[in-house]
């Protein structure tokens, strides 16, 4: 997941005050996407709302995503329709994409350090493209998989320059979700999760990335069949979760997965917020 971004409006999205609000929630279905589990009825819109509210009450909204949340507010009108993009964006789409690439298979701290080192060594993307691959590898080595990631970044920049004659992805802001997915999928090393993160964070689109934390929690709650893999989980959840809940719910599930010992596979994180397994707000949703 990317780090915090930018937005102006101080207020955060208002959560519904009563369960009756859920009746107004749209189903968020995408006409062009196919649900691999059309007969699996969960999660319902009401369940998504309830989980969102329970996690929000338990954790508060994660500070690392607060600025992205503000961006979403100022890029939409009163009824939630997307309008013009914020004018004060500090992070370009290309920056966000590379940042997400560097976050693969490493910790948040290491990926942030790798991106900072890359930008320090090569201030512009033209500098990165002109650099030797070994130099890029050295700059991002702290993030792991340096050779693979350096090759992916170089290939992305090379193909982008050939296609658009400049190193810029801002044109994606004018495309539909399906068009954005088609564009980014052409680049080697950019998978569904990376695309979904860019859609949700940099482009303020309604998408629901599925990382390890979200995947494990979704399976534990029975939101997908036990045999589901991450790609099918992504397709199913994007069909089932209402668009207006996707951003908050995704950020909260990701954060909860990092902090809750009960929800962490193999009990890895010892810095979890919950000292008592029974305090996990998701226990009542588990199968």
Positions of the model-derived regions?
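N-terminal polyanion-binding entry modules of DNA glycosylases/AP lyases
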Residues: 1-175, 242-245, 251-287
